[in-house]
């Protein structure tokens, strides 16, 4: 986003918060397309396309200029006058541009609030691994958890209203509203039966994440307000992302839901040990409170979604569980709080006692069965975990085939470096290693035994040291602590995208 600062300073329309003129600027679409190509090192094959060019952007801008009014053909979307026959290509281009433009107010407010400081820390907190140290420090002292499935789809007008707090330009909002309804007619992102937006990350990921985050930000703002009002809690400033108008609206909504004075109802939610974490399409609310308090939270959330967002939120989407007896899937890990029992012998005069100490510990395990299912879906093995060859890679060079399998092993070792027990990764490495050998043997029309015998020990060594290669990104091989760190949990702050093999849900 740093590239656009110079353009924004030259554009006087930004002084008044007008974003609509940026839609007609070619560099916006070029920057948006380049920004969408950025991928994490965990992605195996970044998708690069050459469909975005200045010629296409010029043609799109010309059509926007020449179109006096937007005509939507609900029954014959293939002959749309605005996008023409290349509607899919134009929709991808304009969605990237719109998402990039609407992000500008968020970015400007972030930069102004940070004052050029703390940006590196903010980027580190974007890591997928960043919540895990927080969970380790806090979840071991809590006992109750609300497992929440965030409801969707959402009505189109609610999405526009959510963005209205950030985008003050009415013209941009009108264009967004038109674009949402146009997608509704195309039946790509929106169900034709209902004028509601169904979040689908498979297409237009940038626009999807922008809309989804604005939608969830509206929902999560009430947690900050309740946290701020509680006298027992420390308040962390999130003024960059939230406006005061949010809190007053949620305050009135809370009064309507409980039909009583707000301050009289607030005491139900005062809890000094409440924590909230969101991941993918789920969120968890963990507390040390009683079951009565957790049921009140559940009732409030159900009523809040139904009253404020106007959608049916079934109570069955909120599950109340006890942490010591509950395991939940969190970012590709199977997480739980387990008790570690240790016997201590105590001697008092002539009497000896055995004391059983139970210590709670946040545990993160590799979900072996779902991960094998992901490998089977990617055609590395069958459903039973038996390795198979990868026929579509037999046309590649031997070095390319080995590098592809090795990168997958390294990425999995990198991602699951925080696992409490890493023995499950040995099974995954074995599957990938043997799948690589079968792929190479199939290419050379040989048996696996004969091929491994001719290849030597270097082939095995590269896969066995893939985890050490990942750890060496942080710790030097010559460091005396490297051998000890190798067996402990490590959380990285550079993992921004989740690997496809770990995203098994």
UniProtKB/Swiss-Prot annotation:
Q: Please indicate which superkingdom the organism of origin belongs to.
A: Eukaryota
> Per the record, a Pfam family?
Intron_maturas2
Question: Where primarily located?
Answer: plastid
What GO cellular-component annotations does this UniProt entry give?
A: chloroplast
Biological process terms from the Gene Ontology for this record are: mRNA processing; RNA splicing; tRNA processing
Please list every transmembrane segment annotated in the UniProt record, as residue ranges: none
User: Keywords, A to Z?
Assistant: Chloroplast, mRNA processing, Plastid, RNA-binding, tRNA processing
Recorded GO terms, molecular function?
RNA binding
Question: Where is this protein localized, as stated in its record?
Answer: Plastid, Chloroplast
Similarity-based family:
Belongs to the intron maturase 2 family. MatK subfamily.
PANTHER family, sorted: MATURASE K (PTHR34811:SF1)
Q: What does this protein do?
A: Usually encoded in the trnK tRNA gene intron. Probably assists in splicing its own and other chloroplast group II introns.
- What is the name attached to this protein's record? Maturase K
